């Protein structure tokens, strides 16, 4: 187990121009709005999956696989370009990259709203992923350049809390829109918010860049894009097939890993690397990165099937489902901005371990949910999950971002988001395949009376089974009960797997994150920062701001 670091903390003297310092909270508000747009859209989509799966004119008749790809096409492009966007932000200017990203995201949203088929929706979601890849790293990178080091934990906590706000607003907004408008309105609603964000960015957000970026590492950029795209595609393909031994899965996964190994070797030998690999040798930094990947692995898979549990099994509407998830968001909004105070008292190790255990407990609770579980139990579980997340994300994000010089904030943010997205993609794919394969195994014995042409479709998901049952009329009534039972059994198995991943994350942070530093300073702002940040002789020069 690691010991609290006593290495010197980089000087935290005045580095932000006074005029910019005075408007730092207004800038943070604009950054939160930009982040809100991106996260809100994904949380809306989780509530809308049932509607999109319905036949036209209600939806577009998307299959379970197409629903997953409407999420995963976004993830594939997003994860593949995160390193590149962070690097470009450090070199070209973070404000420019942010403006580009939010504009592309708005265009993609408008196109997605007008999609006439699942294929078009998947393509336009990829465009949205392209825009988001340039937004999320830039928001955190700008934050690191407008706040002094001692205020960064507080600002990051508020920034992380905005994710909770998006989680709260998204499903409720989606439910209201779906009850009154067509399904495309969940994307069209982004457009006016994007226009507002663009106006505020032009007015308030300063530009900043690395004053001495060196030559752009073109081979490194290309290797990172190819490696990440291949890896994430293979993961997604494995989840789609529910078989990770298929050659169409192994080839891209192994190919992606091989390219990423070449990327790491290249970065270690380059005199102008896109990512300084030496940071990964620091236990606190690597543990923080691993924690992000593991917690999103566990949560993203559960988030995907919870919408089906609430709407298909429990019979709640999209709006009601959004309201039921509200405690998770409220907990994040309440606790994330205050997480730094708990870290200062108990240290990052204890706080993040406790957060991971809360998340794991919440995930394990799904293994006991039935069709008639009291609503108050669901609310308590969602609140515990949100409280756990609120005590994980701010401390580990601070550990990652304060490990790098301010001039490399874009790269640090890209690392943060890349591991989150790869972890999330793994969660949807692996846990999604566990859910689908378990469901098919449970329901197959009840499909004997289903016409052969519909049998394969009926075993795809609970929504597909219920749709086939409706087509069969009175003859399909006998499928409804077994479909609910099969889904609940599959959800229980998947929940146990998710909780195990959450426990693995707790072990990682307990072993490697720094504990409470002598004198009462917490692990992220002091111990973690010292353990992972440049020492005094490596203190970077101020970034250019304007």
Task: Give, region by region, the residue ranges found by the protein language model.
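Cytosolic juxtamembrane N-terminal segment immediately preceding the first transmembrane helix
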Residues: 1-38
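Hydrophobic transmembrane architecture of multi-pass small-molecule transporters
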Residues: 10-13, 17, 196, 399, ...
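Transmembrane core module of solute transporters
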Residues: 27-77, 182, 219-220, 233, ...
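Transmembrane alpha-helical cores of Major Facilitator Superfamily
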Residues: 36, 72, 76, 103, ...
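Small-residue-rich packing faces within the transmembrane alpha-helices of Major Facilitator Superfamily
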Residues: 79, 106-107, 130, 191-198, ...
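C-terminal module of multi-pass small-molecule transporters
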Residues: 81, 92-102, 116-120, 138-139, ...
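Helix-loop-helix hairpins in multi-pass membrane proteins, especially solute transporters
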Residues: 87-220, 224, 237, 322, ...
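C-terminal membrane-cytosol helix-exit motif in multi-pass small-molecule transporters
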Residues: 192-209, 227-236, 255-269, 506-513
């Amino acid at each position: 187990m690691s010991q609290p670091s006593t290495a010197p903390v980089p000087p935290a003297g005045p580095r932000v121009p006074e005029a910019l310092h005075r408007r730092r909270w207004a800038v943070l508000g604009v950054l939160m709005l930009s982040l809100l747009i991106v996260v809100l859209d994904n949380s809306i989509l989780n509530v809308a999956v049932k509607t999109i799966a319905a036949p036209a004119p209600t939806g577009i008749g998307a299959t379970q696989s197409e629903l997953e790809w409407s999420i995963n096409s976004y993830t594939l492009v997003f994860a593949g370009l995160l390193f590149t966007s962070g690097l470009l932000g450090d070199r070209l200017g973070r404000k420019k990259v942010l403006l580009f990203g939010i504009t592309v995201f708005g265009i993609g949203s408008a196109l997605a709203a007008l999609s006439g088929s699942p294929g078009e929706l998947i393509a336009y979601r990829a465009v949205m992923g392209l825009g988001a890849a340039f937004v999320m790293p830039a928001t955190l990178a700008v934050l690191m350049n407008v706040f002094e080091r001692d205020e960064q934990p507080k600002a990051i906590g508020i920034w992380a809390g905005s994710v909770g706000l998006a989680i709260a607003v998204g499903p409720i907004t989606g439910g209201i829109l779906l009850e009154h408008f067509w399904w495309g309105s969940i994307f069209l609603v982004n457009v006016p918010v994007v226009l507002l964000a663009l106006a505020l960015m032009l007015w308030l957000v300063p530009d900043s860049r690395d004053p001495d970026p060196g030559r752009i590492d073109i081979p490194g950029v290309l290797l990172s894009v190819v490696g990440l795209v291949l890896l994430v595609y293979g993961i997604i393909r494995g989840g789609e097939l529910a078989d990770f031994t298929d050659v169409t899965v192994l080839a891209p996964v192994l190919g992606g890993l091989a390219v990423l190994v070449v990327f790491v070797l290249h970065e270690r030998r380059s005199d102008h690397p896109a990512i300084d690999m030496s940071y990964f040798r620091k236990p606190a930094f690597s543990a923080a990165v691993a924690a992000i990947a593991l917690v999103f692995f566990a949560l993203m898979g559960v988030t995907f099937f919870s919408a089906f549990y609430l709407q298909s099994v429990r019979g709640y509407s999209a709006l009601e489902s959004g309201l039921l998830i509200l405690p998770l968001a409220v907990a994040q909004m309440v606790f994330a901005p205050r997480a730094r105070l708990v870290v200062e008292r108990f240290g990052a190790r204890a706080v993040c371990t406790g957060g991971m255990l809360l998340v794991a407990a919440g995930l394990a609770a799904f293994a006991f949910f039935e069709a008639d579980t009291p609503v108050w139990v669901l609310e308590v579980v969602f609140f515990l999950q949100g409280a756990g997340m609120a005590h994980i994300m701010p401390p580990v994000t601070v550990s990652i971002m304060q490990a790098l010089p301010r001039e490399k904030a874009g790269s640090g943010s890209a690392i943060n988001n890349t591991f989150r997205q790869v972890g999330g993609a793994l969660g949807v794919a692996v846990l999604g395949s566990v859910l689908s394969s378990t469901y098919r195994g449970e329901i197959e014995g009840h499909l004997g009376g289903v016409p052969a042409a519909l049998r394969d479709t009926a075993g795809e998901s609970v929504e597909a089974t219920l749709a086939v049952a409706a087509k069969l009329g009175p003859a399909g009534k006998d499928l409804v009960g077994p479909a609910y039972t099969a889904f609940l059994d599959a959800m229980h198995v998947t929940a146990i797997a998710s909780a195990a991943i959450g426990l693995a994350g707790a072990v990682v942070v307990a072993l490697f994150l720094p504990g409470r530093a002598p004198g009462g300073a917490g692990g992220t702002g002091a111990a973690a920062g010292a353990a992972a940040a440049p020492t005094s002789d490596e203190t970077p020069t101020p970034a250019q701001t304007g």
